[in-house]
Amino acid sequence: MAPKVSDSVEQLRAAGNQNFRNGQYGEASALYERALRLLQARGSADPEEESVLYSNRAACYLKDGNCTDCIKDCTSALALVPFSIKPLLRRASAYEALEKYSLAYVDYKTVLQIDNSVASALEGINRITRALMDSLGPEWRLKLPPIPVVPVSAQKRWSSLPSENHKETAKSKSKETTATKNRVPSAGDVERARVLKEEGNELVKKGNHKKAIEKYSESLLFSSLESATYSNRALCHLVLKQYKEAEKDCTEALKLDGKNVKAFYRRAQAYKALKDYKSSLADISSLLQIEPRNGPAHKLRQEVNQNMN
């Protein structure tokens, strides 16, 4: 039975959300449509509310397998509020379901420019990359549509949203581990991982650490057994002052290779930045047991000791 709701956009949207959570996608879609009509009839511009309603109705269409209307609504939502993550993800999923892999790839990559830890986008890129390599061959990247450059303002808008809007990112690291670490990569996956890691290395040389993180993350989706990929991504996190992420990546690197000197050094740097001087000194000590004459490590130890005094 449909809920009784008054002619309030907010109440209609809330009722639609409840129906969606209950799996009543048709009813939810109808409520979002009523809210859209009411909002548009008012004549007062509220692009963010209108964008959310289009995006929510798109989610209903996607659940019902109506990919064409999902894409239309996501495009309408993005026209109102460009670079919104949810409509980008939903449109990417719809494109993927329709086997429009190039368009799906563009939307997933756009999401990763906004937040490079969104699990569903990372997993989507993994699937789409395989499909594109199989269908278009080794030069598949040259055959893609242009990938839009996300302005800094859009990235800041996303990072400033309340924490409940970031639920997808909170699980990204654990999803990465469960999705990739429990399987042995094929020879083809190992090669793809190597190529992506090299692309990341080239981006680091050019000073583009944010895009390099994306490449390393893609590489790890194909093969999570390369210690150097984790320690290389840790370097990027350090440059971007993402110290906790750097520490986590170095820890993963050391699980794979307990003598990874760069991982010890970079984790020591991260601990120093986090003011965990005891852990920093412990990593430096471990490093110097492997390379007693490592100059940067000796210098870092002096800096940490000075900070402790």
UniProtKB/Swiss-Prot annotation:
Membrane topology value: Peripheral membrane protein
InterPro entries per the UniProt record, alphabetical: CiliaryAsmbly_MitoImport (IPR051982), TPR-like_helical_dom_sf (IPR011990), TPR_rpt (IPR019734)
Comp. bias intervals (Basic and acidic residues): 164-178
GO biological process, one term: protein targeting to mitochondrion
Modified residues annotated as Phosphoserine in this record: 8, 160, 186
Linked residues for Glycyl lysine isopeptide (Lys-Gly) (interchain with G-Cter in SUMO2): 197
GO cellular component, one term: cytosol
Gene3D superfamilies: Tetratricopeptide repeat domain (1.25.40.10)
Annotated PANTHER family: MITOCHONDRIAL IMPORT RECEPTOR SUBUNIT TOM34 (PTHR45984:SF2), RNA (RNA) POLYMERASE II ASSOCIATED PROTEIN HOMOLOG (PTHR45984)
Similarity field: Belongs to the Tom34 family.
Protein name: Mitochondrial import receptor subunit TOM34
Source species of the chain: Rattus norvegicus (Rat)
Gene behind this protein: Tomm34
